[in-house]
Regions:
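An amphipathic alpha-helix adjacent to DNA-recognition modules
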Residues: 2-27, 41, 87
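Residues in soluble alpha-helical coiled-coils and helical-bundle/repeat scaffolds
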Residues: 5-9, 31-35, 52-53, 70, ...
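Hydrophobic recognition helices of helix-based DNA-binding modules
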Residues: 14, 18, 22, 26, ...
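Amphipathic alpha-helical packing segments from all-alpha helical-bundle domains
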Residues: 20, 56-61, 73-100, 111
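Hydrophobic alpha-helical connector segments
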Residues: 24-59, 109-116, 137
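Helix-loop "lid/cap" segments that line or gate small-molecule binding pockets
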Residues: 29-30, 45-53, 60-71, 142-150
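C-terminal peripheral helix-coil segments that are non-catalytic and often amphipathic
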Residues: 38, 42-50, 87-88, 92-96, ...
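Hydrophobic/aromatic-rich alpha-helical bundle segments in the mid-to-C-terminal region
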Residues: 76-80, 84, 98-145
Length: 151
């Protein structure tokens, strides 16, 4: 049954079953051993793999969720929570890497993390349209490279 035909509670459960594991996987990658650059790369592999992995079901679910969020507070809160968790996890990695001198000097970790999440969300649109000019893996690698000191 399409998400738009389900009860709001059931549709949110479906959303949670797909989104929460992605957030948890990014959290594991962010907290793994390794340098901030390695952890950032792993976290982005998870995020871009999930969002750009040609899963039309996930893409449709999130795109539908964004539309519902305009009129449904529960969707708005759920999707805001998910986005903020991802942003904060990435921000923590970026901030640590900047302090340790691995990432660009003066890096605005919060703004860069938000840009990364936005780029990943753009992959959902590409997945819905059967791909884009730049693969999610290439985009992920480019974003990591842009954060590195000396890039």
């Amino acid at each position: 049954m399409p998400a738009s035909m389900e009860s709001p509670g059931a549709a949110l459960e479906v959303l949670d079953k797909r989104i929460v594991p992605i957030v948890e996987a990014v959290a594991r990658a962010a907290r793994d051993a390794g340098s901030p650059a390695v952890r950032l790369e792993r976290a982005l592999e998870v995020l871009f793999g999930a969002y750009g992995g040609s899963d039309p079901g996930l893409s449709a679910l999130l795109l539908e969720g964004w539309v519902r969020a305009q009129r449904d507070k529960q969707y708005r809160l759920r999707l805001a929570w998910q986005r903020e968790q991802l942003r904060l996890l990435l921000q923590d990695i970026l901030a640590e890497g900047a302090v340790r001198g691995l990432f660009r000097s003066g890096l605005d970790a919060g703004a860069v993390a938000a840009a990364i999440v936005s780029a990943a969300e753009g992959c959902l649109l590409q997945a819905a349209m059967q791909g884009g000019a730049v693969s999610p893996a290439e985009l992920s690698r480019a974003l990591v490279a842009l954060t590195l000191r000396g890039a």
